[in-house]
């Protein structure tokens, strides 16, 4: 409960000029050696109707003087007790501190308010449960470099040297630049690289740059700068990776400035899909087209985004010089997006990729690619014929045309379009294997026989004639006569000989007369 006097003092904002010193003392509104005191506003006071101070500044002054009465008055005016304690610590007025000691639950709370290192240390000493390391940690946290300087020799003591790393990290986390610089120059930091992780996480370029000063100055002092070039590059590459992963272009440029590898930076930008960083580096560093093409291979290998691929292709005008290498990566990594982008720019590498797929990939990969790019069966089969992939042709043609008769029909049409003899022979062999695997209708077998004659497929025709004779006998008379005419017209003597043999069988069986035979041969002349 407040007394009536306290209530009056708390709410007095104006003092009459004719109040005597005695009256002011009686009211408790007199500050020894300063004069009258009263509230001016909520957070300030007026001394002797002239000097205006904030309540907390006045509290610190009263604490320095050990004036408990004024402290009590200022607390009544909603001042912060911490400032009175700080003032008392500064001038070692421990009577005042003892009076209010019980009201301070945690002495660490006062530390951010203290500017003087000696007072700072005195305040921390009142935290009886804390140790020397706790003092150093708070010195770092609240930027009291002089305390660290004071205890430098203690920090170098082998018993607590291991604490240097945690103090360094704390300084970095609180961005105490002066302390970081001092630690770097005066103390052995076990893992100085921590500064870079913190700088990247907080996007603090100044801290990032300071890290290089600390590391390279240390190496210089130790005389190992040249000997550590390999280690240096490992560190720089790691920093490039961190910076690019977080999309921090200024950090990338800072690392390059300190010797980072531009090609490594470009590679990381590609693999991390950092298009803006990649674009900037290519333009500013005048990257050569062959290097950009290698980056394109890397982008394909890593399944990079459309934007990344488009950017790289745009720098080489969508013209790939080493098509073979690009195709190899597309096939190996099953990364076809680049083909679609090139198709949009009228650059077709689909056939080249299909050829490599047919050569080196599985049925499932080829089928997926054919479906993805809507490739015509004729195009695929011609490539597969050229590469002698009979099993692949049989499997995929079966997928396309489930009906064997339909399959043979379409394959026969493709044979007509193949210009070279070995290719036609290869595909005809496949057609014959399909015939051997299924039971075709009689009329389809007859069509196949005439097809064999037209392409001089001697062995297959002979095989078909044998089947027809054994299963249809004399019913094949018309076919043999037709085949005789075709063989003569195309000048295929071996086929003509086979047909003549079966015409003799027909004659022996009485299915054809001598006159009909003579008439057939006369028609050929």
From Swiss-Prot:
Keywords: ANK repeat, Repeat. ANK repeats lie at residues 54-83, 129-158, 261-291, 324-351. InterPro entries: Ankyrin_rpt-contain_sf (IPR036770), MGF_505 (IPR004858). The keyword rRNA processing does not apply. Pfam families: DUF249. Plays a role in virus cell tropism, and may be required for efficient virus replication in macrophages. This is Protein MGF 505-6R.
